């Protein structure tokens, strides 16, 4: 008989489950399949009465294409939702979009110029809606388990009305107030900014030591003595109205040359080096309180200002004497109020100086540093000038520097609700305790929330001013009336109608006016727990999951708003992920030139490999993107796919039936139960990288050991042999486990695999299946087999030596003389497990026996003597030869 006859007699099947994935084609095919069959909707109907699990989607900003961070975020959420859904929970996933704010407004203004507020708002609204549609189309390519017809967006009348209901609640609780305070001000945006809208970037500032002349002295200082002042913002010297000292700090009056100077004693040596003072003389020592009330001459204008006490004075840097410009610094402001200092505002909204700047009026604040320095130089008031590079606040949208600037603004008091916030944080589950501390620091230690913005595209602050220009906050019926109008017409009504048209009849024609400011956009997204319609579900929701920057953003505003409205956190658990960085650890972005388009990645690799990269990342840290890392995930995917293909192919003739297992088959079945348990535990902990690693490691071990030893049974035994069916039962068990296990991560591949699985009560989609439950794992059985693997390792070391010396080609050519006293080892089929020709037991050392036995041409195993083929193959062939000859 020829070789082809033997080959054709083996149990070798073909499969339509291809080795090549063709993911790009299959992504579209299965996405269409899921949409056509309304799989998401069917899942929700099926799970409707089950326990709920709600992951609330934080809304991305509706501007521009999605970036790799968007894709990472949505996929991580989708993995959780898919797993929870398969685990039996009712878990609707409702995507949202944040639509108001400066980027869109600026884009529209650049397109149409400075038109009316109504026109800017109309165009901004249209643009935001178009961007939602564009981003939605891109998000669909990520194979998310959701219905993009059921979304929420912050510019709908219903959402806006609910947002204003929450604002009304804040007002009714006495939390909203208006005050003149220095706040972050962005000249580039011409608006106030909250802390959440600040990004710290490197910036070069002047480091200037100048002097102020004392006008009238006392027992410690004299007229014309010079106060040494340090500043990095010379432009604020125009608004100077006082100098602060530390009451209990020690100060010195020193003489250098012809001049007398005053500075902190602890900083004298340091400054003497900077000023190159070689021969100074200490004239007197005194505490800071000794010169309180002393007057000095303003460095620029002809006016007199006082020395006052300041708790913020530090001896770390500077001179121990701090220049105060009360409308340009928070500490300055409070000290100015306490001491009735003059409040000078010389900077307009656009950052240019007004008439209060005298000869410098019309200058942009940053450009004036040079001019003011030159002015002081001419008056011989500069002791030292250098430049420092330091971290400086910038507008997170325009990336331009911001300043502290005193303007009348609206605030929400955080001080009044701090205890409530602390209590709410205690109820939140965090994966790590340091994350709890981070949120606490961001929320509880923050200043009062600045909620007003001087822009057009946003939700209006629905506040009226009476004829005396006082805000009307004590008329709830006015708020209710406006909210009803917004619910019907949208927030545009505030700008379309006159003040009287917006008021209930009894408050009309009283000479009232309306507020022009809008609410902080973080207020918009921060009410989504209440304003978004998530399948009629109410907070607290199970998880909020966003980038780590949201501790000061969405996590923060959502918590504050929910505590004010409901009295509890809107989320039970908080998860966060890092940023996507390149191979060098640099954050990826278009502006840095290292950004990567996720749509191009999807086109090249397919969605499942992209999702595998996400799952296989330690997302709680920054996530590295590189071609090399993607190729590693391609290799993992290939291993999974090839293993699945082997399983499917070798189950072609298997009908799902349970078989009693023994020996190694029982050991492997037990291992599969452990695999199931570990997968469940890590999905429950949202440790997807561990899920991937566990699956990958199992496949490697399974292939290297079990598949190696059972291929002979699968291919060469009778089709219906019990041994073969026992092996197939394990293959079937593993195939089902892998299919379900990868479904949350790789939905396309899981769906394709499912189409090849035979089972009773099969669903229309794998994603409608139930996730497997935890199973009993026999630790004693598992431990018992450790003894075998120790023997296997030692035997194979000896066999490898024979192969390296070219005495043999394969392990199945040799015999093993094995030293062992173990009853367990003697009870198992070592010939099969070690894949050798024979095994004998010995009292001496373990040896490899070189045999010159005959090779069976059908199964390629070696035997002492065969009659054309081995006995097993002869028995198989004796049944199929008549079939071949018929």
Swiss-Prot record:
Belongs to the class-I aminoacyl-tRNA synthetase family. IleS type 1 subfamily. Its EC number is 6.1.1.5. The gene is ileS. GO terms for cellular component: cytosol. Monomer. ATP binds at residue 590. IleRS has two distinct active sites: one for aminoacylation and one for editing. The misactivated valine is translocated from the active site to the editing site, which sterically excludes the correctly activated isoleucine. The single editing site contains two valyl binding pockets, one specific for each substrate (Val-AMP or Val-tRNA(Ile)). It catalyses: tRNA(Ile) + L-isoleucine + ATP = L-isoleucyl-tRNA(Ile) + AMP + diphosphate. It holds the Pfam family Anticodon_1. GO terms for biological process: isoleucyl-tRNA aminoacylation. The lineage of its organism: Bacteria, Bacillati, Mycoplasmatota, Mycoplasmoidales, Metamycoplasmataceae. A motif ('KMSKS' region) lies at residues 587-591. Signal peptide: none annotated. Keywords: Aminoacyl-tRNA synthetase, ATP-binding, Cytoplasm, Ligase, Metal-binding, Nucleotide-binding, Protein biosynthesis, Zinc. It is found in: Cytoplasm. This is Isoleucine--tRNA ligase. The keyword Ligase applies. InterPro entries: aa-tRNA-synth_I_CS, aa-tRNA-synth_Ia, Anticodon_Ile_BEm, Ile-tRNA-ligase, Ile-tRNA-ligase_type1, Ile-tRNA_ligase, M/V/L/I-tRNA-synth_anticd-bd, Rossmann-like_a/b/a_fold. Binds 1 zinc ion per subunit. Catalyzes the attachment of isoleucine to tRNA(Ile). As IleRS can inadvertently accommodate and process structurally similar amino acids such as valine, to avoid such errors it has two additional distinct tRNA(Ile)-dependent editing activities. One activity is designated as 'pretransfer' editing and involves the hydrolysis of activated Val-AMP. The other activity is designated 'posttransfer' editing and involves deacylation of mischarged Val-tRNA(Ile). It comes from Mesomycoplasma hyopneumoniae (strain J / ATCC 25934 / NCTC 10110) (Mycoplasma hyopneumoniae). Its main location: cytoplasm.
């Amino acid at each position: 008989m020829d070789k082809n006859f033997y080959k054709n007699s083996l149990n070798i099947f073909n499969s339509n489950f291809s080795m090549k994935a063709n993911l790009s084609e299959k992504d579209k095919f299965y996405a269409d399949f899921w949409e056509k069959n309304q799989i998401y909707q069917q899942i929700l109907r099926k799970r409707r009465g089950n326990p709920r699990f709600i992951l609330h989607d934080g809304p991305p900003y509706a501007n521009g294409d999605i970036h790799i961070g968007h894709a990472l975020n949505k996929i991580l959420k989708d993995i959780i939702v898919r797993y929870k859904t398969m685990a039996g929970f009712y878990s609707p996933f409702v995507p949202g979009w944040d639509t108001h704010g400066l980027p869109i407004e600026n884009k529209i203004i650049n397109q149409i110029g400075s038109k009316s507020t109504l026109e800017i708002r109309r165009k901004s609204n249209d643009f935001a809606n178009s961007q939602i549609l564009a981003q939605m189309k891109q998000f669909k390519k990520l194979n998310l388990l959701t219905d993009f017809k059921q979304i929420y967006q912050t510019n709908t009348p219903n959402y806006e009305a609910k947002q204003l209901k929450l604002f009304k609640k804040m007002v009714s609780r006495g939390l909203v107030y208006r005050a003149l305070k220095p706040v972050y001000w962005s000249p580039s945006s011409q608006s106030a900014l909250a802390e959440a809208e600040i990004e710290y970037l490197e910036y070069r500032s002047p480091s200037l030591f100048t002097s102020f002349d004392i006008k009238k002295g006392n027992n410690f200082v004299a007229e014309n003595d010079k106060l040494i002042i340090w500043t990095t913002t010379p432009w604020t010297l125009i608004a100077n109205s006082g100098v602060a000292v530390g009451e209990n700090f020690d100060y010195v009056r020193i003489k250098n040359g012809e001049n007398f100077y005053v500075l902190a004693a602890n900083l004298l040596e340091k400054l003497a080096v900077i000023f190159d003072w070689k021969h100074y003389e200490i004239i007197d020592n005194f505490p800071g309180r000794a010169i309180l009330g002393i007057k000095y001459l303003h460095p620029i204008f002809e006016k007199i200002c006082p020395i006052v006490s300041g708790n913020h004075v530090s001896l770390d840097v500077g001179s121990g004497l701090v220049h105060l410009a009360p409308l340009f610094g928070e500490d300055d402001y409070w000290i100015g109020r306490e001491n009735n200092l003059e409040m000078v505002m010389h900077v307009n909204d656009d950052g240019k100086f007004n008439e209060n700047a005298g000869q410098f009026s019309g200058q942009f604040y940053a450009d004036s540093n040079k001019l003011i320095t030159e002015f002081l130089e001419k008056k011989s008031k500069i002791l030292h000038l250098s430049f420092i590079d330091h971290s400086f606040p910038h507008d997170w949208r325009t990336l331009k520097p911001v300043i502290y600037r005193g303007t009348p603004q609206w605030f929400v008091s955080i001080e009044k609700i701090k205890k409530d916030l602390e209590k709410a944080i205690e109820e939140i589950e965090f994966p790590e305790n340091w994350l709890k501390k981070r949120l606490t620091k961001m929320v509880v230690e923050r200043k009062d929330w600045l909620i007003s913005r001087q822009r057009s595209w946003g939700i209006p602050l629905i506040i009226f001013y009476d004829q005396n220009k006082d805000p009307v906050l004590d008329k709830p019926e006015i708020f209710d009336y406006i909210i009803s109008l917004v619910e019907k017409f949208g927030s545009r009504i505030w700008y379309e109608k006159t003040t009287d048209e917006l008021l209930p009849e009894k408050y009309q024609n009283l000479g009232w006016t309306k507020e022009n400011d809008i609410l902080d956009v973080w207020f918009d997204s921060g009410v989504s727990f209440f304003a978004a319609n998530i399948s009629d579900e109410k907070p607290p929701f199970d998880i909020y999951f966003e980038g780590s920057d949201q501790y000061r953003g969405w996590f923060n505003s959502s918590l504050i708003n929910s505590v004010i409205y409901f009295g509890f956190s809107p989320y039970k658990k908080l998860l966060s992920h890092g940023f996507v960085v390149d191979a060098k650890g640099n954050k990826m972005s278009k502006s840095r030139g290292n950004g990567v388009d996720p749509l191009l990645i999807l086109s090249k690799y397919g969605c499942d490999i992209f999702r595998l990269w996400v799952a296989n990342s330690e997302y709680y840290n920054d996530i590295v993107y590189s071609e090399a890392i993607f190729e590693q995930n391609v290799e993992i995917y290939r291993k999974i796919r090839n293993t699945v293909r082997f399983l499917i192919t070798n189950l072609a003739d298997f009908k799902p039936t349970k078989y009693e297992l023994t020996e190694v088959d029982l050991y492997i079945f037990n291992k599969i139960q452990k695999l199931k348990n570990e997968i469940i535990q890590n999905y429950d902990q949202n440790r997807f990288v561990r899920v991937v690693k566990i699956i990958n490691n199992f496949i490697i071990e399974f292939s290297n050991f079990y598949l190696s030893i059972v291929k002979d049974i699968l291919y060469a035994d009778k089709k219906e042999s019990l041994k073969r069916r026992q092996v197939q039962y394990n293959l079937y068990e593993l195939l089902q486990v892998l299919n379900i296990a990868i479904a949350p991560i790789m939905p396309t591949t899981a769906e394709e695999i499912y189409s090849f699985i035979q089972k009773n009560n099969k669903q229309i989609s794998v994603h409608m299946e139930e996730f497997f439950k935890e199973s009993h794992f026999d630790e004693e059985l598992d431990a018992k087999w450790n003894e075998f693997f120790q023997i296997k390792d030692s035997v194979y070391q000896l066999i490898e030596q024979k192969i390296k010396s070219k005495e043999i080609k394969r392990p199945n050519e040799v015999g093993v003389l094995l030293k062992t006293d173990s009853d367990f080892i003697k009870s198992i089929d070592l010939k099969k497990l070690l894949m050798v020709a024979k095994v004998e037991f010995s009292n001496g050392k373990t040896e490899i026996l070189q045999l010159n036995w005959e090779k069976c041409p059908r199964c390629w195993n070696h035997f002492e003597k065969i009659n054309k083929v081995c006995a097993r193959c002869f028995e198989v062939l004796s049944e199929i030869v008549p079939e071949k000859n018929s």
